[in-house]
Amino acid sequence: MSHGHSHGGGGCRCAAEREEPPEQRGLAYGLYLRIDLERLQCLNESREGSGRGVFKPWEERTDRSKFVESDADEELLFNIPFTGNVKLKGVIIMGEDDDSHPSEMRLYKNIPQMSFDDTEREPEQTFSLNRDITGELEYATKISRFSNVYHLSIHISKNFGADTTKIFYIGLRGEWTELRRHEVTICNYEASANPADHRVHQVTPQTHFIS
């Protein structure tokens, strides 16, 4: 499969640990409800339709009966159509505690039916991933680049050295906007207003932005 890689300088930081009721944390990652699952594609999945199963409620992220594993090599490409416009603020990628865990994630926006050949182009943002087996690490996006997203593509370009890649959960945090003729409805899928009230580790990883 064709693919390219590019990186910029960056580092990691973990926010202070914060407590939050599970139902509020679940609401924060509620954008999965705004995905058009019937049209969602996962390229190079070993079992057809399994890629849809990793977009699930945050409180079900530890359910290991639902996962996606790559087929021919370590790459996966998710094409995610939303039912409205999204302002994407953060992503969680949860995998196995071994070399099958993704090590790099590349995000593209508004390219429906994206193929692996299309990943030759520059992504909106690239993340170097840490192993996350609990679904607690959030990778913060450059919000100005993801403020009007109707289609998100997530390219898992490599893992930590295994032949295949396995993912149990992908969490998306942000705002969803439904455009109507007479009104605009905005659903804010974020944690509580007071950041000291909930627990989340936020990671600012290596990134690459289009200039």
UniProtKB/Swiss-Prot annotation:
Family according to the record: Belongs to the PITHD1 family.
Gene Ontology CC terms: cytoplasm; sperm cytoplasmic droplet
Keyword match Lipid metabolism: no
SUPFAM superfamilies: Galactose-binding domain-like (SSF49785)
Keywords: Activator, Cytoplasm, Phosphoprotein, Transcription, Transcription regulation
Record's function text: Promotes megakaryocyte differentiation by up-regulating RUNX1 expression. Regulates RUNX1 expression by activating the proximal promoter of the RUNX1 gene and by enhancing the translation activity of an internal ribosome entry site (IRES) element in the RUNX1 gene.
One Pfam family hit: PITH
Domain PITH: 20-192
Compartments, as annotated in UniProt: Cytoplasm
Sites bearing Phosphotyrosine, chain numbering: 189
Database matches in PROSITE patterns: PITH
Name the record gives this protein: PITH domain-containing protein 1
Region described as Disordered: 1-20
InterPro entries in alphabetical order: Galactose-bd-like_sf, PITH1-like, PITH_dom, PITH_dom_sf
Protein's organism: Mus musculus (Mouse)
Main location: cytoplasm
